Amino acid sequence: MVPEPRPGGALLWPAAILRRTNVMDHRHPVSGLRYPVSGIRYPVSGIVKIAARLWTRLIHPMTPSRFDALTSQFARLRVGVIGDFSLDRYFDIDPAKAETSLETGLPVHNVTRVRCSPGAAGNIVQNLGALGAGTLWPIGFCGEDGEGFELLKALRAVPGVSLDNFLRTPDRRTFTYTKPLVHQPSKAPVELSRLDIKNWLPTPSDVEEELGIALRNLGPELDALIVMDQAGVPDAGVVTPAILRHVRDLTLAHPRLFVVADSRHGLGRFPPLIFKMNAAEFAVLNGGRADAALPELKAGAERLATASKRPVFITLAERGIVGAAPGVPAVHVPALPVRGGIDIVGAGDSVTAALTLALAAGAQIEEAMVLAQAAASIVIHQLGTTGAAHVPELRARLFP
């Protein structure tokens, strides 16, 4: 739970927080520290700094030396990312330049800038690169179209990327999110209705076979693999049943390989891997509720980790993240305090990237979750873009 913004540059602790607070001694319900009744309202800058320091000292176990030891390993790590790569294309619109179409009488939105970046699995690659991963192998496809050209250009700009295993094929369209954003002075960008380009027919078997061969050949080279399923049309993306069989075979051939799976459409069809999901996705998989209380979520994560013999992570937005490993009690790491306006697009990808690098670097699950929460906290404050976090930013966020 984080303070709520109020007009005039102040924050109030939400009513739910105050109801759980001992009114007699005025203790904060998370930190246990006292604060005066008259001091419940604080200036924004002060409360954010106080909350961040309390989170650092009382909630997470990371020390600066441990942080440095883990993140210094990122540069040696070799990570593959197989899944649905999209082009995120932003149309920046200036409403002051609005016109009316002479032909239709409809409003005309004049675009003053076009920005392109890798999306979906590509955004995970971008986050891995920003965190300093040594070598990155995207494994997926794009079409022989303009969007594919822009996607390849954006991927090439990510440090450490090798595109030797990325296919460009005339049999597929490039998965594209086009996001019109209206910009006004002193206001957060407003996104208009999105325009998507997807493939609606099954992925050709020869494309699947090429991707499977790439995965098999890369296996011995990898420290970690991320499987990202986002296409939304059954069997029309990269993560088809055939590709999941290749992933399963890879885990059997390389049992020490960290393989993290993230799917917008449910992990129930996946082989046993390290699962990362949000609360709604976990509810579908586990038969529970997305708004379940923490004890219920922790118990469910423990059961799933025991059954799969792999760690499980559940992201909970403003409630933080829950993680469990086989035979180890589940752990909850709260979210960091919010600092002004936020944009949650891309936060899940930053969590996936940070969790994967941390685990491959030797982190315990709680340490990995701390790094992931710091990454998400940075990304959500990057407005109008999917965003990415860098190691120095993580350090500054965790140790203010």
Task: For the regions a language model picked out, list residue spans one by one.
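Arg/Gly-rich low-complexity intrinsically disordered repeat tracts
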Residues: 6, 27-46, 53
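Targeting/processing segments of secretory and organellar proteins
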Residues: 9-11
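N-terminal polybasic/positive-inside topogenic patches
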Residues: 13-21
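Generic short N-terminal amphipathic or hydrophobic helices
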Residues: 16, 39, 46-49, 58
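Residue-level detector of intrinsically disordered terminal segments
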Residues: 20-23, 61
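Ribokinase/PfkB-type carbohydrate-kinase core domain
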Residues: 54-99, 103, 110-342, 361-363, ...
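Short glycine/threonine-rich catalytic loop with a Thr-x-Gly-x-Asp
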Residues: 336-355
